[in-house]
Amino acid sequence: MLAITALAGLDLAQWQALLNNVAFAVCLGAMLFYWGGAAFPQVQLLSELGLAGMIGANLTIAALLTARWIDAGYFPLSNLYESLFFLAWGITALHLLALHWTRSRWVGVTTAPLATGVVAFAALALPADMQEAQPLVPALQSNWLMMHVTVMLLAYAALLVGSLLAIAFLIVTRGQEVQLKGNSLGLQFGPSQPATHPEWTEATLPSPAAELVYAGIRSPRPAEPPPQPAPEGIPLQRLSLAEILDNTSYRLIGLGFPLLTIGIIAGAVWANEAWGTYWSWDPKETWALITWLVFAAYLHARITKGWQGKRPALLASLGFGVVWVCYLGVNFLGKGLHSYGWFF
């Protein structure tokens, strides 16, 4: 009863500080539960607790952003602290989406550390004055703030999670070339084959991009190529996990790329209204273009060249670093029109 009374007496700033710490604790707990579930797969409860932790983290971060929105009077995307928490919220939301697609604990093993790291950086590494809500600078007092920044951060979240799953694919396959079930679009042609692992069929669902590419096509489907033997040293269970990681990575990148495109276009329109030019080759703009080109090359290679497995995973791994440079790295320069809210 005393605890409830104490919580009821907190103001919005105190609620934000509390939710800040709770979000980190819940993310850390979810990560540890997922890792425990991977180490002891017979204990199903561990993975279920990891899922509960990621749901809790998503709701806690949403509550934190809502409290900050009410307290500050604007949507909380004006500085690095706020954008990091929104990015973490996007990562946890996409984790839940990917888990819905795959039903695989290994998605959580991969994505929970990413969410935990982002929240830890925001909650523990940033100075206290950076975590306080500040009045919007004139350039950010626009309705375009929510449109441009939210879409860009959701794009970053999708691309980061998708790229991280591609890195996990390379680890699982030990960097070897493997023959995956189905084609690079995530479709199975010809008669369906019995699954060799409980999670195999979930990994072969068509990606959003594949559904668009093959919509309306009525030509006969080619027969599925004969199965290839597993590379030496890679068990069949690892190959089924690799299939899950490859297809889920592709689907998330296929989701993040159009969001990135929309975000860049919205930013260009906003820039023209604020500064009188659509494009000024600001460092952030330049790296956003580089990010777009990297993932455009990834999707082009998969859709038109039929790439799958190792080669697109390497390209996505490059994209993982490029996204971080675009989001955080260019802020180290302290220059340009996008240098708001850095702590140097």
From Swiss-Prot:
Record flagged with keyword Chloroplast: no
Pfam families attached to this UniProt entry: Cytochrom_C_asm (PF01578)
A single BP term in Gene Ontology: cytochrome complex assembly
Sequence intervals crossing the membrane: 21-41, 45-65, 80-100, 106-126, 151-171, 252-272, 287-307, 313-333
Subcellular location field: Cellular thylakoid membrane
Membrane topology category: Multi-pass membrane protein
UniProt keyword Transcription present: no
Example of a GO MF term: heme binding
GO cellular component: plasma membrane-derived thylakoid membrane
Keywords: Cytochrome c-type biogenesis, Membrane, Thylakoid, Transmembrane, Transmembrane helix
Subunit structure: May interact with ccs1.
Family of this protein: Belongs to the CcmF/CycK/Ccl1/NrfE/CcsA family.
PANTHER family (UniProt xref): CYTOCHROME B_B6 PROTEIN-RELATED, HEME EXPORTER PROTEIN C
Protein's name in the database: Cytochrome c biogenesis protein CcsA
